[in-house]
């Protein structure tokens, strides 16, 4: 498979897996189906969803492209933005801007700063979030994220790797917490 500009695209294991479901592609982190799905939807649709999920460094000039399906974002994404996007999946498709505190009071209990009203924006349907969560639960049960599986707690997540494994990413959530981890070397 090639990108529309002719650049070849490979899966991280350098093999072609033939026809697979989107679910299988998520579980086993297979690149080509992700790019094919984004191509069918159009990179602009994917770009617009990422904007709604709070990705602040996106460039309409450079990032409305097929590699967006694999995290190919020109100016990158922060762990905080990635965590907030995964929190939206965990919350039925509702995005909330991340906050570092909810309320600050003085010694008498007077509210000095109130950040408790963090309104949600419905980015995608709850049914979509549920299907995605279910597939990402299987990433931890039998896919590329088995090492992140937790005993006695539901968890869902997704792994990601750049060329030559210079960057390794895991983002996921439990019913209580959402986190993204990025490991890199030069």
Predicted segments — roles?
Residues 24, 28, 75-186:
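A penicillin-recognizing enzyme superfamily signal
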Residues 58-62, 183-186:
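The feature captures the short pre-catalytic strand/loop hairpin that immediately precedes
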Residues 1-19, 96-110:
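Short, glycine/proline-biased beta-turn/loop segments that scaffold the active-site neighborhood
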